[in-house]
Amino acid sequence: MNVIKKQIARLFLSSLFLPSLLLLNISNFSFAELPKDIQWETNTDSPEWSSDKALKGGTMRYSIPSFPPTLRTVGPDSNNAFRSNLLDNQMPLVELHPNTDEVIPLLATHWAYDKDGKTVHYKINPLAKWSDGENVTADDFVFALELNRSKHIIAPWYNKHYTEQVIDVIKHDLHTISIVGATPKPQKDLHIFYSILPRAKHFHQLDSNWVAKYNWKTEPNTGAYQISKIKKGKSLTFTRKINWWANELPYLRNRFNPDAVILKVVRDPNTAFKYFQRGELDTFNITLPKLWHNKAQGPMFDKGFIHKIQFHNDIEQSASGIFLNLNNEVLADIRVRQAIASALNFQQVIDVILRGDYQRLPTFHTGYGPYTNNKIKPIEFNLNNSIDLLEQAGWNNKDSLGIRIKNNQRLSFKISYGNKLYEPQILLLSEEAKKAGIEITPYYLDSTSFYKNVIEKKHDMAWLGWSTGLRPAYWQHFHSDNANKTQTNNITNLANIEIDGLIERYRDETNEKNRIQLAHSIEKKVNEKTVFIPATMKTFTRSAFWRWLILPKNEGTKSSESLFNPFNIRFGGLFWIDSKMKFQSLAAKKSGDGFEPVTIINTQFKPL
């Protein structure tokens, strides 16, 4: 047995020099060998974006609008707002630098590109550990592929993507793998399109009971924090790992500083803001103009206990707007969809409610560099055009309230939304739409119920914004494979053969110039279908925070969607808690003293 162990050790150390495709069978091990001529790369020279002045310790408290329906990150009900807190603590092999977009190592120490143009080889950091103390190995990546393909997880998008796009995960030794994609792509894109997060093989048992069994189990992770306490319906606590294995790694040191992060469920945003003003929460997102201009003021701001910051970023824009469900027989008529788009006065929303701070979002994928089709503009507000389209579609009569009628059916829709802060915008839009004879009724659901309603395709219209990626993602949102099915992201149920073909070509295209042209074509075709009505966009984030939360000198990065995200591996975890300042501040507050008010405007990364 000692001989076998020595052989395995030699294989790990000399894997660069082994001939291609040969399988070595030693005892119970089966390792595929690496190609001879690959060149390993790493990057520890890019500038770090944390502060060496950061202090560890303290507890950060912030609010979430609803309790998660599950702790699973795949399967039924997993596509919810809370999931990012779990995924952000599951480290990827590599990431893109938040300022330079260079590839940087995380769970992997090195990577190498295969000559086939579709395979990347990775060396997993041998120090990497799961939160339960087990080592992270190649087996966890091989198992991740098995899990993502399994019918037991009830996740059709994952099943298809990890079968048709991620072709294989090959184990070469305990800490070396290859990820094989379906088609060649530019090198940086390989890390994006064919990425796979590891799954702790020793933790999971894949069978028909998997969904129910793991609904409330805390899955081992590799990031800085793990869930340590759950109060059902009330709060979740994440605790920083003692002696986290990645503490001193480049790009991770001096980050993820609080000892604990408490996520408190506060369903009403107005109530949450009151908790924040009382010091029961440490930070509050005040990006919306109503909050920044109106609510973020008063004694705690004037006396310098609470600071304000507006930080400009340069990121891909969220696809935020109104999604129309084509399973609604009225919305299946494109003339009705175009009429609705023409009846929505977003410029009035920008001028009146958003105080001119926002702009109209042009199209679904905006801010993706050359991949963005800058020729596309949203349908402009035009009541006459809306009325003409409705009359062409046969909606010629009105009831006593002025709402159009056809075949005894009113032109009336519910618009689902999961954040009450958007309610004033929806109400203003619906008032204008009435002038064209369209009734749009606000239908508020708490965020968990809202996501469930949308992902099960039960909505007429839904107002939401999707998180962004580093490249346009068409297949999940607009391919017919994901239409008319629950638990997929094609929430418009668009199914169009021509668009399907373009999306498939886009996925398979190896030439970047051609891929960009295809992206422009897809965006144009989707825009013509009017299944998504773009809302608004902004190029900044705004936060209010108690003065004991300290940010680095530059406050954030080009990619910072939020300055106080405690977990995000790319841009989060930069702040820290100054316990002495907290003690000093609370004493001053009690005695009636104060400090200079602070408002920060950082335009370093403001787009030109």
Model-derived regions: residue spans:
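Aromatic- and charge-enriched surface segment that lines or borders ligand/interaction sites
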Residues: 109-154, 178-180, 265, 272-275, ...
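Extracellular/periplasmic solute-recognition and catalytic clefts
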Residues: 150-151, 155, 228-239, 264-328, ...
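Gly/Pro-rich hinge or "lid" segments in bacterial periplasmic/extracellular proteins
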Residues: 90, 97-99, 194-255, 260, ...
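Detector for C-terminal structural segments
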Residues: 43-45, 87, 231-236, 240, ...
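Surface-exposed binding/hinge segments that line
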Residues: 55, 123, 158-207, 224-231
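Alpha-helical secondary-structure segments
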Residues: 61, 137-144, 174-180, 223-224, ...
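N-terminal lobe/hinge region of extracytoplasmic solute-binding protein
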Residues: 34-48, 58-115, 146, 220
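Ligand-site clamp/hinge motif
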Residues: 210-216, 246-297, 430, 437-446
